[in-house]
């Protein structure tokens, strides 16, 4: 989504990257004008990250793979049991957050930076649920990836609260967060 007057102005804009764009992008886009009017929110470019898939089951499999930092064996077993009940669902996978973050940092962001009027020093990540878990994982393992993190209802429960161990490790080596965080 682009701010008003984007095409005629030659200024650089902050950018917000949002995962689960199929579920979140429309609501965010429709809320923006009011939020910007009432809250003096600056104009920015909204980039939705989503999947080209063969349906909701395929989408869920890709989402589970990309937004989770580990293989959660309890969750994986439960998902496989569900798949047996519902039939021909795709193979369950998880633990691809490192690769997904590399893809965002090395492919998506350079593409957006080159193609649009982006302020490279003003980039925000926005994610909910497993997207929130991914945001926390990114914050604690590669905080320089974004200046701000908007994290809604993160799936802290994932893999016996693995993300809390990642946070403890980060806290051992850092006194402050390198970004602004909105939970």
Regions found by a protein language model. Name each.
Residues 1-183:
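Non-catalytic cap/lid and distal C-terminal segments of serine-dependent acyl enzymes
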């Amino acid at each position: 989504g682009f701010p008003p007057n984007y095409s005629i102005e030659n200024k650089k804009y902050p950018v917000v990257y949002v995962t689960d764009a199929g579920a979140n992008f429309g609501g965010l886009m429709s809320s923006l004008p009011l939020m910007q009017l009432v809250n003096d929110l600056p104009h920015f470019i909204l980039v939705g990250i989503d999947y080209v898939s063969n349906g909701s089951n395929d989408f869920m499999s890709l989402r589970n793979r990309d937004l989770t930092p580990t293989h959660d064996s309890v969750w994986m077993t439960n998902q496989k049991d569900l798949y047996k009940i519902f039939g021909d669902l795709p193979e369950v996978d998880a633990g691809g957050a490192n690769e997904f973050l590399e893809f965002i940092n090395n492919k998506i962001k350079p593409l957006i930076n080159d193609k649009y009027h982006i302020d490279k020093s003003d980039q925000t990540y926005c994610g909910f649920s497993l997207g929130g878990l991914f945001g926390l994982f990114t914050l604690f393992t590669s905080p320089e990836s974004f200046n701000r993190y908007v994290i809604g209802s993160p799936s802290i429960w994932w893999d016996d609260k693995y993300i809390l161990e990642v946070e403890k490790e980060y806290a051992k080596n850092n006194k402050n967060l390198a970004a602004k965080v909105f939970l």
